[in-house]
Amino acid sequence: MATQAVPATAKKRIRKVFGNIHEVVQMPNLIEVQRESYEQFLRSRPADGYVSGLEKTLRSVFPIRDFAGTAELDFVQYELEDPKYDTDECRQRGMTYAAPMRVTLRLIVFEVDPDTETRSVLDIKEQDVYMGDMPLMTENGTFLINGTERVIVSQMHRSPGVLFDHDRGKTHASGKYLFAARVIPYRGSWLDFEFDAKDIVNVRIDRKRKLPVTSLLRALGDAVIEVNPDKGKFEAGDIVAISGVNRACRVKAVAGRLVTVEDPTGAIIPGGLIQTAEGEKIGHVARIRLQGMSGEDILNYFYRTQRFVRGENGWKVPFVAENWRGQKPAFDVVNADTGEVVFPAGTKISPRAANKAGKDGLETLLIPTDQIFGRYSAYDLIDESTGRIYIEAGDEVTPENLEALDKAGFDHVDLLDIDHVSTGPWIRNTLKADKVEDRDHALSEIYRVMRPGEPPTKETAEALFAGLFFDSERYDLSAVGRVKLNMRLELDAEDTVTTLRSEDILAVVKTLVDLKDGKGEIDDIDNLGNRRVRSVGELLENQYRVGLLRMERAVKERMSSVDVSTAMPNDLINAKPAVAAVREFFGSSQLSQFMDQTNPLSEVTHKRRVSALGPGGLTRERAGFEVRDVHPTHYGRICPIETPEGPNIGLINSLASFSRVNKYGFIETPYRKIVDGKVTNEVVYLSAMEEAKHTIAQANAELDSEGRFVEDLISAREAGEFLMAPRDHVTLMDVSPKQLVSVAASLIPFLENDDANRALMGSNMQRQAVPLVRAEAPFVGTGMEETVARDSGAAIAAKRSGIVDQVDATRIVVRATGAVDAGKSGVDIYTLMKFQRSNQSTCINQRPLVKVGDVVNAGDIIADGPSTEFGELALGRNVLVAFMPWNGYNYEDSILISERIVKDDVFTSIHIDEFEVMARDTKLGPEDITRDIPNVGEEALRNLDEAGIVYIGAEVEPGDILCGKITPKGESPMTPEEKLLRAIFGEKASDVRDTSLRLPPGVSGTVVDVRVFNRHGIDKDERAMAIEREEIDRLTKDREDERAILNRANYARLKEMLLGQIATAAPKGIKKGSEINEELLAEVEKREWWKFAVQDDARQADLEAVKAQYDDAVGLIVKKFEDRVEKLQRGDELPPGVLKMVKVFVAVKRKLQPGDKMAGRHGNKGVISRILPQEDMPFLEDGTPVDIVLNPLGVPSRMNVGQIFETHLGWAARGLGKQVTSALEAWREANPDAQAATPPAAVVDRLKEVYGKEYHADIEGRSTDQIVEMAGLLKNGVPMATPVFDGAREADVAEMLRRAGLDESGQVELFDGRTGDQFDRKVTVGYIYMLKLHHLVDDKIHARSIGPYSLVTQQPLGGKAQFGGQRFGEMEVWALQAYGAAYTLQEMLTVKSDDVVGRTKVYEAIVKGDDTFEAGIPESFNVLVKEMRSLGLNVELSSIEDQSDDDDGLAEAAE
């Protein structure tokens, strides 16, 4: 059958995928979180109306006004210029990759009229001010700070908003629940409401002393403003803006000129302007009275009232059916209208009876008088004429005050509807317990709590309270907080209202009281709807705001001390605080981390990490189990598997593979919509809050051809619970089975068969795998390998479609074929990184995958990086494993390996160490980098050039000199004679000492790169010049190649346009008017072609356009080249006092050796115990020795059975690969001339058989060459993919083994390599993907003879980095004491440690060949004596002989 031809760059190797579930949505880019967040911080998009975080921050601080109000500094716009150095230059020079930021500021100077206090503008000045550099993010989502790559980890913190909770009965002895509510702002004071043990509702501000909540409520309330109307009329419900109040207020009531405005907390100024929301003036404030809530207001907000009317023999009350349901009255309930008994005393009223009575027309009941005693009055009942108060709002009705009411002629009372069952008297009790009378009293109480010890005045108390929650400068809920508040309290405020309002506070208290009454649910703090993520942009925005506020204070002071009329914005601004804040954030914040660059996966994971630690977050010590635990809302948002072991477990998490962070900072995960029972391909992203009301089916639910569920009951999730739901209840469906795990966990095949703890170790250890010299993708993968390689930036993808023009090991040149934008080059040059050092000293090396002439499409992988093969992640190698014990060398997870692995460099890796030396300017003179080093023989200098720097390619050993350096020595003052001799005979060699850079112990390798940096204005040495020339040659080659490709493309286009045209102007020697043809053009040099002009005007215009474009492009290429060269020749910016710096890079080849740590992907880790000769290893029937022997006991107890499945499937993959190879070999033998041969039908059939029918079309579409190449790559094994939770089942594995012609048990007969005997039992053998981890024995092994000592204690330092010794600790001392080894113990504690004199003597004795020594006084004794003296205790050491002499002396003196 004819199929579409497969393009040349199509995958050379196909992975056979076992998954059945078709994914409808593409996985978002893995580092999108970082890039998106920083982009939103850095750049505004005026077209979309989006304001960047940076601009918001600047606008929140500006305008800055001086104290007198005579000047104002306003922000206009900001601009980020092009960065000074590109990323590669920053990496080499140790610079920060940042863009200079220019801010346009406007200084407005006012003249203030002293009488009317009106301001008029005197002068306006605008100026661009440089405000430091803003670090830029690289394409891969990292920052280059001082030349090192860093990642800003996102932080998970509590979302602003309101949270309701209780103490779980822990506070009070009775175990009753004490409910609490907390309003958390983004910044500002925290507001806590809580019940105490006496059921009084209290409030705390910023965790200070508690107050009754009614004090806070009395401080709230409305302003009654007397208005001088200008025009227009006020109506209730209007939104108005009042001068001095920094947000809109709602009009509550209007009575003539008195307007009640809701909650305008803030300083309303008499005479202030009142405007409509549209900005139209309405009137001025004449007088103002702020009135707090009265006791009546408070009670009527929280309780319903019931009116009781005096009747004969009792009180009449309206009948409300729901109040009587389930009641058992102790009296006859009588119908007030007819007098008949409706509910007899002592009978329980059923809901049905209550409803029936209502339907039968019962309206009013009569109840006995004693039934209203103990209820509470809703209002103050007062005698209007005398002012006598009979009963206050909230007071209890008693026989006495009821009698007084009777006498005063009250025929009805309004009582609060508190039944002590569904409505409790909590607020009423709080009101009665509260000693505060009115608003002023309440404000002064709040002031006393917030500022204890200061006497409050009315103004200060008012200002403090207004600033706490109602001033947008000091209190900010943020849009998120407002959205959360609206959702929880069912309010409808705009999300721009980011301060609190009275109704917010009232709604919080109302909800809290309802919780106490048993209505509603408390919140779950660990729900992801209540936790949000702060990514880079937001973290930096907060930090920058802090810097700007510091700057604002300085600017205000400067404005009042400088003559503003002559000053420019530049004179007022000092950007240091803002710049320092940014530098501090990137340099030393807990969330700015040194990027884990061990391999591509560790980079991606680091960028997707979410930490609960850091500033404003949790601390390890305080975090309990609940915070660390997996929560149902983590599903699809945060990986339940990948988290560190140890103290950070559960606090540092990884985003799940499909999740993304929305604009409010909540993590969302995608679902497919279900419409009318049919699963659609429409995908919605939902946060944890939005998901709560849905029932969600799993991704593996069975669907029919129309997309409907096959089963009636479906496994689904609803409100965090797993249940079997009827299919018509299901509203959403997961998009993919791997959406609940992170990237690292989704790379583990057969994850579903592993225990969770081991899966955790597996995902963590993949991040520690060292890139090997030869990468090999796994036989058994999961299909995620390509995504990780692409998104991590390790493998290079083509930016534009085009044709490969040139390829060598260091660069790929692609000629773009699509339409080229103006101002852009038509050539893409991809420079490959060759043997560069990563942050973890692993080696970054990229290799091209394309050939000259290949057609590439945008997005195709054109070069492999570290740990990638054919654009797929390749962290380790496939090795042949046998699970069997072998002479105890597998004890405790040890690993026995074959010598072949070492010999063939299977697990060899390259590590690059960087050493640097600086020549400084010292007090005694400058240091010098030179070959002329005192007291060093020629042998030690053999690797140095004339400048004293090691050659590239030199093999170096520990102690070898990498760079010669001499430092001037201090010396005693010289006598005049010495000075004279010095002047005559010149400098002595003895006045300098050797401070050369030498290779430290334990490192030996090859010098791969040397970089020399010189301070500006210092002469460059020969080596620096050579490096510079080399770099300029490389740039010249790039320039010439780019120009050549440009010329080729343009001249071809030009030729096409000129042919067949009539020339109206022509180069020298060509007649005008002649027709332009091939021969004519051949006579003229190409660069002369531009001189042709043609008759056709339209064509002439096109020619001119092409010429202009060509000139621009050439100009761009030349300018780029000149810029680069200028930067190279300019001196380097070095730290102060440094004249010259040399960096030497040494590559070390690390072969596998005993003590290295290895691991599989299932948490099966171990240390190499022995390397066995190949011939001694157990071997298969065909004589193949196995590569690795693992302990079978490592599987059952650890429950990571995935490794066994992997072994079997890997074994089958190898078998199938052999079958394809044998078919290919047979074809090659039959067809020696591959060009003229018939297509390899047998190979194609075999491939179809191996891959299955889904791949037939792809295989048939390939050309003979492609088939041969593809089959050749399957020699080692057929790559397979078993996606997590949707991979190969046991039956599939057995089927693959059968197809490969192997035993379905996966076990084979094995023979002992030493004797040749067969082992008693069959052994499980197969291919496992093993990784070599970064814990290499070479980095850990360490020995010391003599070395550095601590300054105070004089004991040897500790640790490999300090070249320290091994600590002989307390328990080791006990061991020597137990053995009675007194002399050994003595030397351990003295001459081998801190006996300074003794150890010198021992050294001398050893040199002389003497073997006796004497121990002296350890330095630690002297330290102890000094410490005691510092406490005022004079301790002296004297020997016994001295003591006896002194005694005699004393005796004599006494006589």
UniProtKB/Swiss-Prot annotation:
UniProt-listed SUPFAM superfamilies: beta and beta-prime subunits of DNA dependent RNA-polymerase
One GO CC annotation: DNA-directed RNA polymerase complex
PROSITE patterns per UniProt: RNA_POL_BETA
One family name in Pfam for this protein: RNA_pol_Rpb2_1
A Gene Ontology biological process term: DNA-templated transcription
Keywords: DNA-directed RNA polymerase, Nucleotidyltransferase, Transcription, Transferase
InterPro entries: DNA-dir_RNA_pol_bsu_ext_1_sf (IPR042107), DNA-dir_RNA_pol_bsu_external_1 (IPR019462), DNA-dir_RNA_pol_su2 (IPR015712), DNA-dir_RNAP_su2_dom (IPR007120), DNA-dir_RNAP_su2_hyb_sf (IPR037033), RNA_pol_bsu_bac (IPR010243), RNA_pol_bsu_CS (IPR007121), RNA_pol_bsu_protrusion (IPR007644)
Enzymatic class: transferase
Domain of life: Bacteria
Catalytic activity: RNA(n) + a ribonucleoside 5'-triphosphate = RNA(n+1) + diphosphate
Record-listed E.C. numbers: 2.7.7.6
A GO MF term: DNA binding
Similarity comment: family membership: Belongs to the RNA polymerase beta chain family.
PANTHER family, per the entry: DNA-DIRECTED RNA POLYMERASE I SUBUNIT 2 (PTHR20856)
Known role: DNA-dependent RNA polymerase catalyzes the transcription of DNA into RNA using the four ribonucleoside triphosphates as substrates.
Subunit text: The RNAP catalytic core consists of 2 alpha, 1 beta, 1 beta' and 1 omega subunit. When a sigma factor is associated with the core the holoenzyme is formed, which can initiate transcription.
Xref: NCBIfam families: PRK00405.1 (NF001616), rpoB (TIGR02013)
UniProt protein name: DNA-directed RNA polymerase subunit beta
Provenance organism: Rhizorhabdus wittichii (strain DSM 6014 / CCUG 31198 / JCM 15750 / NBRC 105917 / EY 4224 / RW1) (Sphingomonas wittichii)
Primary gene name: rpoB
